[in-house]
A protein has these predicted regions:
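Basic/polar, cationic surfaces and motifs that engage anionic cell-wall
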Residues: 1-7, 17-19, 25, 90, ...
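N-terminal catalytic cores of peptidoglycan-degrading enzymes
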Residues: 1-92
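Sec/Tat-exported extracytoplasmic proteins
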Residues: 29-31, 59, 66, 125-129, ...
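Exposed alpha-helical structural elements
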Residues: 39, 156-160, 187
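Glycine-rich, acidic and aromatic/proline-enriched surface loops and short helix-turn segments
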Residues: 58-62, 93-95, 101, 190-193
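Short clusters of hydrophobic/aromatic residues that line enzyme substrate/ligand-binding pockets
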Residues: 65, 147, 151, 177
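N-terminal propeptides
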Residues: 168-197
Length: 197
């Protein structure tokens, strides 16, 4: 999994945290028409926004903006509206990873390839941090904010995204050993007897 990095402006995120305390992945969308993961990484590196996310994902790239060891400001704040917020006060900026999907075309059509790429990346994060699919939630589920709006307005779109997180991984292929989840590395090591690459 190739992840590019551009450090967020330090005024836009919080302090260091213990990554063993991560319990949730919160899915957002950027709401900007036709934007990219790189555009967002550039913007948050440059501007003082008092908000942030750990990652931005589009159909081609993943950009890390806030290191996972730091608190990103992506799901805090008060309640909005009357729906959602099932996870309010359970999921916080401190115990979650914020993932922003760049999902809208210039004509406000949902880019399905961005959603597929985001699901693949979230599934990778789930393995890395031991998070189950029930702890992958929308910003809407924390504060009631209509985010990601397409996945709030269309429950089926969210359900399809969640289904992608639990699909069998029999067809997963990895270019580099380091990208493999630990469960996949173990049989390879026992077969080789040692690092054989």
């Amino acid at each position: 999994m190739e992840i590019k990095t551009k450090a967020c402006n330090p005024t836009n995120h919080g302090k260091a945290r213990d990554i063993d305390g991560i319990q949730y992945i919160v899915v957002h969308y950027t709401s900007n028409l036709g934007d990219t993961a790189k555009n967002n990484a550039d913007y948050f590196a440059r501007e003082k926004t008092k908000g942030s996310a750990h990652y931005f994902v589009d159909e081609h790239e993943i950009w890390e903006s806030v290191p996972i060891e730091k608190v990103a400001w992506h799901c805090g704040g008060g309640l909005q509206g009357s729906g959602g917020h099932t996870f309010h006060k359970k999921c916080t900026n401190t115990n979650s990873i914020g993932v922003e999907i760049c999902m809208l075309t210039k004509n406000a059509v949902v880019r399905k390839d961005s959603i597929r790429h985001a699901a693949e990346f979230v599934r990778w994060l789930m393995r890395q941090y031991g998070i189950d699919a029930n702890h992958v939630i929308r910003h809407y589920d924390v504060t009631g904010k209509q985010c990601p709006a397409s996945m709030v307005a269309d429950q089926g779109l969210w359900d399809n995204f969640k289904a992608m997180l639990t699909q069998e991984e029999t067809e997963m292929r990895y270019k580099y050993y380091e990208d493999m989840p630990d469960w996949a590395k173990r049989p390879l090591l026992s077969w080789c007897g040692k690092a054989c690459w």
